[in-house]
């Protein structure tokens, strides 16, 4: 299976990159345990750039917020000074909806193929639900939180 990924993902890559991938696959095969660290680049590799720019997904789900408030990318939307708490919660709710609706990116499936049958754990700063779709939560540490669990500061609702 790893050879299939190597051939599919590196057939057009320079020889040095193919060689580096081959070394990585060998190290994975030899490892007793694997700790994966993943951040924004993992989702960006799927083409999901909505946190930092107004890509097609951002425009589809949050374009009206951009037009109304002028911020670029969802990350700026988190810190925008909205005119009311309700407007801020409207953004957060729509952001959550977008993350639930966004399809799982192929690189997440590819990573799980590489890790299949191995002793591994994933640490991520990503909050976009991508990992929770492909890995059991006991093998995942979302060290900057998980936006599926938004809650107001008074914690009056689940």
Q: PLM features: residue spans?
A:
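Conserved catalytic core of sirtuin-type NAD+-dependent deacylases
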Residues: 1-158
């Amino acid at each position: 299976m790893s050879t299939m990924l190597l051939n599919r993902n590196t057939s057009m890559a320079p020889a040095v990159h193919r060689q580096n991938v081959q070394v990585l696959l060998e190290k994975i095969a030899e490892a007793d345990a694997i700790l994966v660290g993943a951040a924004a680049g993992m989702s960006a590799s799927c083409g999901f750039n909505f946190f930092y720019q107004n890509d097609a997904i951002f425009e589809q789900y949050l374009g009206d917020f951009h037009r109304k408030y002028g911020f670029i990318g969802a990350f700026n939307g988190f810190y925008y000074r909205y005119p009311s708490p309700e407007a801020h919660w409207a953004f957060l709710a729509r952001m959550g909806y977008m993350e639930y609706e966004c399809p799982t990116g192929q690189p997440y499936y590819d990573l799980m193929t590489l890790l299949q049958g191995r002793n591994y754990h994933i640490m991520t700063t990503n909050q976009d639900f991508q990992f929770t779709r492909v890995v059991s939560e006991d093998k995942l540490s979302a060290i900057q939180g998980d936006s599926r669990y938004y809650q107001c500061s008074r914690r009056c609702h689940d």
